[in-house]
Amino acid sequence: MHDYVIWVREVPGVSRAWAWDAWHGPGTVGLAWLYDDRENIVPTREDLKTMEQYLFCHKHPATGVMVGKPGGIEVWPVQVRLKKVSISIRLTPDSLANRSAVRANLTALQKTLAPGQTLPVSSLRTAIGMTSGITDYFLNIGEDTTSDVDELITIGEVTWLTA
């Protein structure tokens, strides 16, 4: 599985990748990847074609030797569905700088998540509470957020509450 993740990450623009063994039974691999620097981070049809060609056969970046998926292995691209979690936050003290810093921490947190992973409310609280300058906050979410195996939790709209 590790080779597939490495190969996918070698393709320009790919920022995150995951692989699952026996996705549709023996001899199959499920493969998902994202492009975090794009507005729409999910692969397009063209991205899927490019990836299929790259996985079939490409030059190893360090050695120049041709490598690719072994014969008999069927790779299934997994189209990750984004599960946006919208949240409401009230910060003390409330400022544009604090809001930007909290948003940056939430973005960093979402990039640690994998498809099918649960987002613990404690992780949201840590991302907010560890922001320098924040002395208190309110968060409207009180429970962990779960996802299906092909869903990836992302931070959706943040509503900034005022006192």
Which stretches of residues belong to each language-model region?
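Carbohydrate-recognition loop of C-type lectin domains
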Residues: M1-L119
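An aromatic-glycine-centered, glycine-rich loop/turn in mixed alpha/beta architecture
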Residues: N98-A163
